[in-house]
Curated annotation (Swiss-Prot):
This is Aminoglycoside (3'') (9) adenylyltransferase. The keyword Transferase applies. It catalyses: streptomycin + ATP = 3''-O-adenylylstreptomycin + diphosphate; spectinomycin + ATP = 9-O-adenylylspectinomycin + diphosphate. Pfam families: AadA_C. It comes from Rhizobium radiobacter. GO terms for biological process: response to antibiotic. SUPFAM superfamilies: Nucleotidyltransferase. Disruption phenotype: Loss of resistance to spectinomycin.
Length: 269
């Protein structure tokens, strides 16, 4: 599985070597029996942007023992880099699920393992996240079915059950609870702004869009006083300029509260 396929509309040469390494890392661990299913999202979901990470969803046949979990997370850390810190590596986000935990679909579903750069300091300190219920899998699997390339096996829309709209909306409602006051988004302002625009898009359309596409959609629907916040976040995401959202705390909070209110109108509290 470590040889990444190339075909029209699939994985770019730019990330193929890194993807091959990540898949090899997963295969190397004897406790992991990959069920022939791996999907990559960010590389095709609107194309790679300057600070885009690589989102990989892998289905395995069996649960991980603790030794395998620790070894895998340590090795994945070596195949990833924080955005902008490496000329050759992008940040990777790996979500690993056990086949029988998500097929047939049930909500909320369980994830076996997740790796991302935000975990680096914890992993270095010997703190390893266990398997857990993850409401976000409803969103992640919807994204995979709409915007992904299968590295091994059939397409995601053939492999995964559709996520019912009521489960998607429940996951969107729960996600909104993450952001209630300024400490909740401090240091992550741009991502929170862009994520809220995506949630708003999904709440209205029932579909998933790339961050910049959702931002364009949302800007057209925002009152004029809130548009500069989202425009600044979008331009920074595209590498066109740096954002200074952290210095605009009041405007940022007003934007977040407005968009959350619009989302709640669509999906309920």
């Amino acid at each position: 599985m470590s040889n990444v396929r190339h075909h029209e509309g699939s994985v770019t040469i730019e990330i193929s070597n890194q993807l091959s390494e990540v898949l090899s890392v997963i295969e190397r661990h004897s406790g992991i029996n990959v069920a022939g299913r791996a999907f990559v999202r960010s590389a095709v979901d609107g194309g790679l942007k300057p600070y885009s990470d690589i989102d990989l969803l892998v289905t395995v046949a069996v649960k991980l023992d603790e030794t395998t979990r620790r070894a895998l997370l340590n090795d994945l850390m070596e195949a990833s880099a924080f955005p902008g810190e490496s000329e050759t590596l992008r940040a990777i986000e790996v979500t690993l699920v056990v086949h029988d935990d998500i097929i047939p679909w049930r909500y909320p579903a369980k994830r076996e393992l997740q790796f991302g750069e935000w975990q680096r300091n914890d992993i270095l300190a010997g703190i390893f996240e266990p398997a857990m219920i993850d409401i976000d899998l409803a969103i992640l699997l919807t994204k995979a079915r709409e915007h992904s390339v299968a590295l091994v096996g059939p397409a995601a829309e053939e492999f995964f059950d559709p996520v019912p709209e009521q489960d998607l909306f429940e996951a969107l409602r729960e996600t909104l609870k993450l952001w209630n006051s300024q400490p909740d988004w401090a240091g992550d302002e741009r991502n929170v702004v862009l994520t809220l625009s995506r949630i708003w898009y999904s709440a209205i359309t029932g579909k998933i869009a790339p961050k910049d596409v959702a931002a364009d959609w949302a800007i057209k629907r925002l009152p004029a006083q809130y548009q500069p916040v989202l425009l600044e976040a979008k331009q920074a995401y595209l590498g066109q300029k740096e954002d200074h959202l952290a210095s605009r705390a009041d405007h940022l909070e007003e934007f977040i509260r407005f968009v959350k209110g619009e989302i709640i109108k669509s999906v309920g509290k």
